């Protein structure tokens, strides 16, 4: 391992430490979707709760990806599946099955 990679926290020990933390820890500070990335607030004055801002972000991504009519979806290491569950739940009537 290079010094740069180690300094960036990419050591095997750091990775194990991150992934060995149980879900209970993440439930303390994530919303019910368990989305582990920034939410989407409208502006600096937006006081929407985290769950609403996360849903806004998920909806934005699904809309821009055209997921409502997609013929397949691939979820690789995207947390706890919140994005995929939202995509399946918001399928357009008559959309092809996944």
What are these regions (language model features)?
Residues 94-98:
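Short beta-strand element of Class I
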Residues 69-77:
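Conserved class I S-adenosyl-L-methionine
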Residues 62-69, 88-91:
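Structural motif corresponding to the C-terminal cap of alpha-helices
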């Amino acid at each position: 391992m290079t010094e740069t990679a180690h300094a960036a926290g990419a050591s095997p020990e750091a990775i194990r430490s991150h992934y060995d933390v149980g879900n209970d820890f993440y439930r303390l500070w994530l919303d019910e979707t368990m989305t582990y990335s920034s939410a989407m607030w409208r502006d600096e004055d937006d006081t929407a709760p985290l769950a609403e801002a996360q849903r806004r972000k998920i909806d934005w991504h699904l809309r821009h990806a055209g997921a409502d009519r997609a013929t397949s979806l691939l979820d690789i290491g995207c947390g706890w599946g919140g994005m995929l569950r939202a995509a399946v739940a918001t399928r357009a009537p008559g959309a092809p099955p996944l």
